Amino acid sequence: MKTYEYILSATILLVSICGCARKNAVATAADECEPLFLAVRPLPEGGYSLISLSPFDGSRDTLIISRPLSRLIVMSTSHIGFLRAIGGEDAIVGVSGAEYVYDSTVRARIGEGRILDIGYDASPDYEKIMALKPELVLTYSVSPVKSQFLTKLESLGISTFTVNEHLESHPLARASYVRLFGALTGNMSAADSVLAVVSKNYQALRDSVRALMTVPGDGPQSADAEQRICARKILVNIPYKDQWFIPGQENYLSHLVRDAGGEILGSEPGTSISGQISVERAYSLSKEASLWLNVGWCRTLDQLLSVNPLFGDFLMNIQKNAAANGFGSASGSDSAGSSASVGSSASVDGFVSAGGSASVGGSASREGSASVEGSASAGSSDSVGSSASVDGFVSAGDSASVGGSASGDESTHADGQASPQVIWNDNSRQNAKGGNDFWESGVVRPDLILRDLIRILSGSTPATQLTYYQPVE
C-alpha cells in the first residue's frame, strides 16, 4: 500500500490519444487540467478504453473495459477513496496493507473476512491473490523499472492496470481519476457528478480568495500592476530521514496553498519536484513564516520538540510573525485585510449566499447512484462523501473570513499575552496505525482540503470546523 510523506515528482496521465475527454464530463475542470488528459475513452460498442502513460519512460498501460468489474484488488488506499466516493466499494475483494485503511465500512468488511489483505507489493501473498480470482489488480508506479510484483501477476494471467494519480500535480487533475474508477465499475454517471461538484466547489473557493488578493479595477493581472493582500508565508514539513523537503511551486501541495492565499517559503518556481533544505535554512525561513503546516507524524508540540528541540525556536519566530500580522492575535485585527471576507460575497464553503446561486447542500445519500448533495459538516462523519454522496458545503453563516478576528485557537503565555495557533497538521482523520484519510478520501475531495486551508490561513476558525487538519498544540 503506498503512503505519502512528501510528493517528490509529478506525472501526466493521458486518456485519449487525440484529445481531452474532460470536456464531455466536467467542463468546469478543463481549464485546471490542461495539458492533462483523463484516461477514459468511451468505445462505440460500449465500455471504455483506458490509457495510462508513465511519467518516467513514456510507456503506456492500456485496458479495455467491456463490462463493469466486480472483483478488484487495490494496492493503494487512495483507490478506496475513489471507489467509496462513487458507491463502488462493493467491488473491492482485496487490499494491500489493511491496517492503513481509514474508511470504517471497508475496515469492517476486512474484519468480517469479506475483503482480504494480500500483503505489500514487495512481499505479496500470491496464493491469496489467486484464490480471490480478481478481475483486475490496480497498482501504481514509483519508478521506470517494472516491479517483480507486476511481472509475477502477468505470469499468473492476472490483469493489472497502473493508476498514477499520486503523481499528478494539480488537485483537480488528481481528483479527476474518479472517472477511471467510474469506468471500471459501471458508475460513470456517479463519477461525473462527483467530479463536477468537487470542481465547482474548488473553483468557487479559489476564486473567492483571488477576489480578496486582487483589488477590483486593476485591469489585467500582472505582478507589477495589481495590488494584493499579502499572501500568508508558510513553512512546510519537518525532516524526513534527515532530509527536509520543500515542494516546488507546481507541486500538489503548493497549488492548494496558493489557491488558499498562501505562499510556501523556499519553494522553487517552475517545478513540481521537491527540493531539499537544511535545518539551518528552515530556521531562517521560520523568521519569515507566520504559519507551519504538515509537520510529519506529530500531533502535539511535545512530539514535535522530540524531533528537534530547536523547533521551539521555530515556533517562537512563527508566533511572533503571526501576531505581528494580526493572525489570531489577542486584538483580533488583521493587517492582511480584516475587512475582507470570503463570506462577504460568497461563503467560505464556496457557495454564494442567499440570493445568489444555489447551494449544493441537501440530505446525504448513502445508497444507489451518486448524489451531488449532502449536509455533512466538516469532519462530522467517518467517511467523507462516502457511498457516492458528495457532501455539499454548509452554506452562508458558516464562513470564515480571510483575515478576520481570532476565534480561540490560541494559547496564552504566562504574561497573559495570547499566542496564535500557528502549527497545523493534516492528520485529523487518522487511524491507530497511521492510516491517514487525507490520502484516502482527500484525494477525491481537494475542495474540502482547500476549505480547511482557507480557514487555517484566515487565523480565525476553530479546529472543529476543519475536516482533515488539526492544530498541533
Annotate each predicted stretch with a short phrase:
Residues 48-57, 65-131, 136-143:
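A short, structured surface patch at a secondary-structure boundary
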Residues 135-140, 145-243, 267, 276, ...:
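Extracytoplasmic substrate-binding proteins
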Residues 200, 205-212, 228-307:
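Flexible, glycine-rich surface segments
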Residues 273-281, 285-326, 414-461:
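C-terminal soluble interaction/assembly domains
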Residues 327-414:
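Long, intrinsically disordered low-complexity tandem-repeat segments
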Residues 1-27:
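Bacterial Sec-dependent N-terminal signal peptides
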Residues 19-69, 338, 380, 458-473:
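N-terminal hydrophobic or amphipathic helices and topogenic motifs
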